[in-house]
């Protein structure tokens, strides 16, 4: 069907249904079911729905801009793409399990919660902004930007084979970050603000040439790596670096209010300054190529260290 403007209460375009427009197009109504269907425009596409948008195994594509406003969006194994700016806003959940949301320009996503698990892909070639609540990026999920990436979320899960990454500056403000065997990195700079929440980086990687870690509570870096080419500081209530790596090519400053555990772990930098209430470095290595300072107010265990 060739169309330019479509305004009805309920739109059903399921199972190989096709809607195509050569011009700028507006789709408005209560709900849209594009499961297995195709909605394609050669210019801008604006979708405005009071209720749900279902794009399960469907295709929504614009050669111009793409704007979606809906109560909720389910794009499981579906695709939303635009050559221009892409803006998605949902009052409820945005589900992109195994799906693809991509823009050749800027990408802006606002939702109450976000499920990008099961190899879901969210990708912007220019500045990318994601604002959500609970964010599930496990099971191979990918949130990537070829430009800057700004992420604001509540609890973030970034599991095995999953990535949150950018070519330029990456800024993340979250209330908790659970990254078991996932990767969080930038080719330029990374600022991670936990807002006094927990950081779990078991078997994970956090890396950037310039790294800033803010407002950490407890940090679990067992078998993980937190590293930077430049100087960085890690301030936390407790830090477990057992079998983990904390590495800086310049200076590394650790300020741990209570317990620092680094059993068989590595802490290494050009200049290293460590302060904690308790330290267990059994089988671990604290290494500096220059100045080394270790201050412990309480018990020190350094068996085989």
Q: What does each model-identified segment do?
A:
Residues 9-11, 30-32, 50-52, 71-73, ...:
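Hydrophobic lipid-interacting interfaces of membrane-associated proteins
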Residues 26, 72, 87, 105, ...:
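Short stretches within intrinsically disordered, low-complexity N-terminal or propeptide regions
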Residues 14-20, 34-40, 55-61, 75-81, ...:
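Short, T/G/N/S-enriched strand-turn elements that build extracellular solenoid repeat scaffolds
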Residues 150, 178, 191, 198, ...:
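Beta-strand-dominated lipid-handling architectures at cellular/organellar boundaries
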